Amino acid sequence: MRRMARKAIHSDQAPKAIGPYSQAVQVDAGKMTFLSGQIPLDPATMEMVQGDVVAQAERVMENLKAVLAASGLDFSHVVRCTIFLTDLGDFARVNEVYGRYFTGAPPARATVQVSALPRGSKVEIDAIAVS
């Protein structure tokens, strides 16, 4: 698997990241893969994972990991994510889970509070990966 050239961008003239994400990520664009938003569905049962937002975020990240793998990619290829939360009070707990999946400079990211998500999910995450 070829590693893409990627550079985390930081400007002291903009606010520092308040979570596990980069202000920007610059890549030498190769093949782009757009991952649809994942919610905490167990792929074996297609039922929602039981538990709090931490359990849901863990399942969401594992679902993203599976889709990345099916594309021949991993989290090191992700350059952009959007996190949708039904309660921004869950921001720190979701960050803890999310941050464990990125070993290098994390991707650029936005987090948005929404009024509802499919099947009553508390969290949904989509991603863009480049190889």
From Swiss-Prot:
Q: Which Pfam families match?
A: Ribonuc_L-PSP (PF01042)
UniProt superkingdom: Bacteria
Q: Which InterPro entries match?
A: RidA, RidA_CS, RutC-like_sf, YjgF/YER057c/UK114
Q: Which NCBIfam families match?
A: Rid family detoxifying hydrolase
Query: Which protein, by its recorded name, is this?
Result: Protein DfrA
Species of the source: Myxococcus xanthus
Cystine pairings recorded for this chain: none
Q: What protein family is recorded?
A: Belongs to the RutC family.
Gene Ontology CC entries for this record: cytosol
Please give one Gene Ontology molecular function term for this protein.
deaminase activity
